[in-house]
Amino acid sequence: MNAYIERVIEDVKRRDPDQKEFIQTVEEVLRSLEKVVEQHPEYEKTALLERLVEPERVVQFRVPWVNDAGEVKVNRGFRVQFNSAIGPYKGGLRFASHVNQSVMKFLGFEQTFKNSLTSLPMGGGKGGSDFDPTGKSDAEIMRFCQSFMTELYRHIGPNVDVPAGDLGVGGREIGYLFGQYKRIVNAYENGVLTGKARSFGGSVIRPEATGYGAIYYAENVLKHDGETMEGKTIAVSGFGNVAWGVCKKAAQLGAKVVTLSGPDGFIYDPDGVITEEKISYMLEMRSSNRNRVQDYADKFGVEFFPKQKPWGCKVDICMPCAYQNEIGMKEAQQMLDNGIKYYIEVANMPTTNEALFFLMGKGVTVAPSKAVNAGGVSVSGLEMSQNSERLSWKAEEVDAQLHNIMDNIYAASVEAAEKSGLGYNLVAGANIAGFLKVADAMMGQGIV
């Protein structure tokens, strides 16, 4: 391994020994860049990697709010502005109990390369809070969002930092956040947030975009082997917007998603989540705030497996859509035992490094999350363009641009890996392609 890369990784571990998620993503990315770094000695001379792994800014703040019982609650808010070399910081807001600085830094670091892959002018950032919206009333969520934005507004803007949604933050939350921002700054800057409702500057197919993009990317992977999505069975985890988009686009292309999962277990639907009724019901489940996938089994009369994960099901493609590190060695072995051929990461870093390299070593085609799930931020970027132009594009136009972006991300990843002598390696290829654009911009802007 390259001595410079190892030194940078060790420095990260020394500085932030408790930030396991951040260390994991730094190791995975940097170790795939060995050949590129060897070809560019100027990177070490200018401490490029040291600058790359250090966020430009980390903001942490308290978020006090009042629940329906009149009790004052206090949560932590975060915004990690990781890298602005190629554009304003861009990345989602996550509201979940597991949110901490390590999770925010890992997501912001990944976002930097993901945004680079889209070829749109967006830097990398991420934010959120350890506030858990599950079981909260609409009024409580509104009050929390207003308090959160009362601090966040100081650090964002259409040309500075443009947040969006993520886990626990959907269209409702974005609306509350935008309303409070508008009230505080006394200006209608609808480019400050993406993922908005259509009525105040949102883009068509933004809620579905991550799932749509994942299927478009998977199409390219299958095409490489002379196959199509037609007739393929897919195991999916989660049942939120990402899984919903995957189900919709997979059904349109003749494939079928046969599993969904939640904290309570998973469902197996052999007929597939393919009808409009089933796909629409996923949104009802999510908006209920109950966080139970068993409701789907009860409604449609399919099997429910409590407290289990769906990776033991025999399918053609596995697409984890839930949360980081949901796939460890146990789950990877289950997939392998069932003859899995394609493993398409959709959630952010859903696989431990050990499981990731295990699957790759066993000949499974692995597509990395930073490339696969770039559809969401791509359409966010297109929403920013529409806001700047004060226009609203048609669904067909947005979908066509999304499809083109995902095709280009796949092609760039393949080309980058091949140029580095790594063969057909989508994981390394995505890291290299995303890194090179950011590195070139950082080198051109001096030591900042």
Q: What kind of region is each of these model predictions?
A:
Residues 265-366, 371:
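Rossmann-like adenosine-cofactor binding region
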Residues 3, 7, 17-24, 28, ...:
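Conserved active-site and cofactor/substrate-binding residues in soluble primary-metabolism enzymes
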Residues 2-25, 221-222, 336-448:
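Adenosine-phosphate binding glycine-rich loop
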Residues 42-73:
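Structured beta-strand/loop patches that form or line metal/cofactor-binding pockets in enzymes
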Residues 96, 115-230:
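Glycine/serine-rich phosphate-binding loop and adjoining beta1-alpha1 elements at the start
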Residues 20-23, 39-46, 119, 156-165, ...:
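Flexible, glycine/charged-enriched surface loops at secondary-structure junctions
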Residues 202-314:
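Glycine-rich phosphate/diphosphate-binding loop of Rossmann-like nucleotide-binding domains
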